[in-house]
Amino acid sequence: MSNILIKNVDCLTLTEPVKIIKNTNVGISDNLISFVGKIPAGFKHDEIIDGKNKLLMPGLINAHTHLAMSLFRNYAEDVDFWTWLNDKILPAEEKLNRENVYWGSILSIAEMIKSGTTSFADMYFFTEETAKAVEETGIRAMISRSVVSGENSDKKLKESLDIFDKYNNTADERITVCSAPHAIYSCDEIFLKEVIAESKKRNMQIHIHLSETEEEVNNCKTKHLMYPAEYLQNLGMFDLKTMVAHGVYLTDKEMDILKKYDVSVIHNPGSNLKLGNGIAPVVKMLKKGLNVALGTDGAASNNNLNMFEEIYLATVLQKGIMKNSIAIKGIDAIKMATVNGARAMSLNNIGTVEKGNIADLILIDTDKPHFYPKFDLISDLVYSAQAGDTDTVIVNGKILMKHGNLLTIDIERVYFEIEKQAEKLLK
């Protein structure tokens, strides 16, 4: 790895108290941030990045997605959630193969890098191909083999555990692996207990969908005589570090349970809106002290992987439904997309720009019409910034994109392969 000097840059460190340091310098030695501020005497660099009209900040963290679902972007549109899932997506996923998932993963990683995401949490299939894509492209990821009960469930669970044994803390520790029972409606109680028991043997983190729809909640109440989070607590899932995606219909009691067990909630505002599933009570979650992170969900239900869009939605939606413009602040949403995501995914020393932390960083080009006048760059990031403003992306001290040019992905090859894969898959 090389030493990088970023000169004369405005820097949002996200350390407390949160502020922007104007016209500063940041050094990277190997994969770590070596200084913020004055350039130390004797610091030797292999590369200089001019930070003029740029804002340096921690890379964005997409804490819930389904990477290769980019293959189904714009495929199942304007239908209700259960039609979308049962009649369109699940039958299409039955046709997936390793090659499909590899190229779908590469496409999604390219989209994420281009829009400032440096880490993501994925649950999907053919996870070896996702791992291969992560290793090749240089991004950081928590991956998992999603499992459901039913036919071949034991085989799928074994695959999930094998993925952990083979890939956890690999690729210079950029890849971690968690356990991913899909949801309470797709995993019966016996299977969930088995997943939890096997995950405990390896101390695996859990990533699961929870309380995404009203129907899911009502069915759980009817079948188990309790709400979804109560049900999972009763099964012992929260004895393991857990993050739950969506949480749209969490009750006060459920939030208290999640807080007690330090369970993170991954808010997916764009996907929840598009599928008509509602708006999560994020303000209440934050007031109760829950760790709330952000995700895009898959590109089949969003239909992009743009975390700047999720930051914007996470802010304005809560202001709107609360009828209170100060119910949530822009900086809260930025933290959801950075430090809170790092906490949810157990990413230590990531999410802030400070000496000794891992260098997962992005540079935003603020020399754009929608950034002027520059009264408040934090507000600019929340309410004005676009995915295309991402100029440079660094993960683990390695530059993955410089001045908008992807350095680890042949994007024209990706476009060619994706059209070929989609045609074979959905013809």
PLM region descriptions:
Residues 1-24, 29, 39, 335-427:
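Active-site microenvironment of metallo-dependent hydrolases
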Residues 9, 26, 31, 53, ...:
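Divalent metal-coordination and catalytic microenvironments
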Residues 71-103, 137-145, 214-241, 261-264, ...:
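Active-site gating loops and adjacent loop-to-helix segments of metal-dependent hydrolytic enzymes
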Residues 73-139, 160-170, 419-427:
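Alpha-helical scaffold segments that flank or form the walls of functional sites
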Residues 129-248:
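Metal-coordinating catalytic core of metallo-dependent amide/deamination hydrolases
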Residues 212-236, 240-242, 247-260, 273-284, ...:
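Catalytic core of soluble alpha/beta enzymes
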Residues 234-241, 283-368, 384-386:
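His/Asp/Glu-enriched, well-ordered alpha-helical/loop segment
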